[in-house]
């Protein structure tokens, strides 16, 4: 469900049409995107837009109840992983709802992206900077 105003019309539309438990993926510039998935390609150059900025913008619009990340993200890119977890904790506090965080192997993560309504590609070049958000409800 949408919460606010997002300038990117494709991303805004996808969020507005999400039902409870539907998923979207926000990924780095290198994650393979399945041909059958809707691709929202925001990448301009390396690092623009960043993964974290894209997550922040998405969270202003999307109510989430679950997060899936690759296990490798914690060990290979711990600083960015911690930034993401800080944003998730802030989102939990703001919406007063629990958000489940699940870790799966990266190869399994890539397969799981096929379930996403859309995959949002950023310009991020940090390894494993990918997240799947599961839509919640605002009530």
Curated annotation (Swiss-Prot):
Gene Ontology MF annotations: D-ribose pyranase activity; intramolecular lyase activity; monosaccharide binding
Residues binding substrate: 28, 106, 128-130
Pathway involvement of the protein, from the record: Carbohydrate metabolism; D-ribose degradation; D-ribose 5-phosphate from beta-D-ribopyranose: step 1/2
Main localization, broad class: cytoplasm
Ranges in coiled-coil conformation: none
Location of this chain's protein in the cell: Cytoplasm
Gene Ontology CC annotation, any one: cytosol
Active site: residue positions: 20
GO biological process, one term: D-ribose catabolic process
Family in the record: Belongs to the RbsD / FucU family. RbsD subfamily.
Self-association state and partner proteins as the record states: Homodecamer.
UniProt xrefs under HAMAP family: D_rib_pyranase
Role description: Catalyzes the interconversion of beta-pyran and beta-furan forms of D-ribose.
Name recorded for this polypeptide: D-ribose pyranase
GN (gene name): rbsD
